[in-house]
């Protein structure tokens, strides 16, 4: 693959990862999370803050890349849990509930790095958003493919997929059959937070 097709797949990989989580959210709650763009900004800012330590252009990384990724995952999943709690337990419409982070998220992202845009010059960190030497495709394409395969297996061989669809089709009927609709809706937003973390890390 080369040229425009590779570019399209590269840029589309971020959207593909987000679509995985958004599909679960839409299936369970019947709404969309409009704050994903702002949450990605927060996730990326957390990564930069951990790796750069508040400096604009550090000579070396201030923390291992895996630590930055884990911090990004924790923050993104907490933001997803915040949205999920508003929708699942406070019964707020998804678009209204996620409007909070949609409005505040980018300001939070700017605050994390003191309105600066740090630059990371470490070559190994660049591999996650570009190419790993020796591989024919950009790394984000591989990461997106792995995420799609994992969620497909989870939905196919676990109860999560069935429960998510059941709650989305008829929440009250699911409750009468022993499911906990609020918990399942909450879980889908947390999973979306994880997807946002991965997308924010590679982009």
Give the positions of each predicted feature.
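Helix-loop-helix "hairpin" substructures at the membrane interface of multi-pass membrane proteins
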Residues: 64, 79, 83, 134-203
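Alpha-helical transmembrane segments within multi-pass membrane transporters and channels
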Residues: 55-102
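Interfacial loop-to-helix junctions that mark the boundaries of transmembrane helices
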Residues: 2-10, 59-70, 128-142
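Transmembrane alpha-helical core residues of multi-pass small-molecule transporters
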Residues: 40, 44, 75, 101-105, ...
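Transmembrane helix-bundle core of multi-pass membrane transporters
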Residues: 90, 94-159, 184-187
């Amino acid at each position: 693959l080369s040229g425009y097709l590779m570019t399209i797949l590269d840029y589309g990989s971020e959207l593909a990862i987000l679509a995985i989580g958004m599909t679960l959210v839409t299936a369970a709650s019947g709404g969309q999370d409009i704050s994903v763009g702002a949450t990605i900004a927060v996730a990326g800012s957390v990564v930069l803050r951990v790796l750069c330590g508040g400096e604009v252009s550090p000579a070396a990384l201030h923390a291992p890349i895996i630590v930055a990724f884990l911090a990004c995952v924790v923050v993104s999943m907490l933001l997803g849990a915040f949205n999920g709690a508003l929708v699942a337990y406070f019964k707020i419409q998804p678009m209204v509930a996620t409007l909070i982070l949609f409005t505040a998220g980018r300001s939070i992202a700017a605050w994390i790095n003191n309105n600066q845009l740090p630059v990371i010059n470490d070559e190994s960190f660049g591999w996650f958003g570009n190419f790993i030497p020796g591989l024919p495709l950009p790394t984000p394409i591989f990461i997106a493919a792995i995420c799609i395969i994992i969620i497909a297996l989870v939905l196919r061989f676990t109860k999560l997929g069935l429960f998510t669809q059941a709650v989305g089709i008829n929440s009250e009927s699911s409750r009468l059959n022993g499911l906990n609709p609020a918990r399942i809706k909450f879980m889908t937003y947390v999973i979306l937070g994880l997807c946002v973390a991965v997308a924010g890390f590679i982009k």
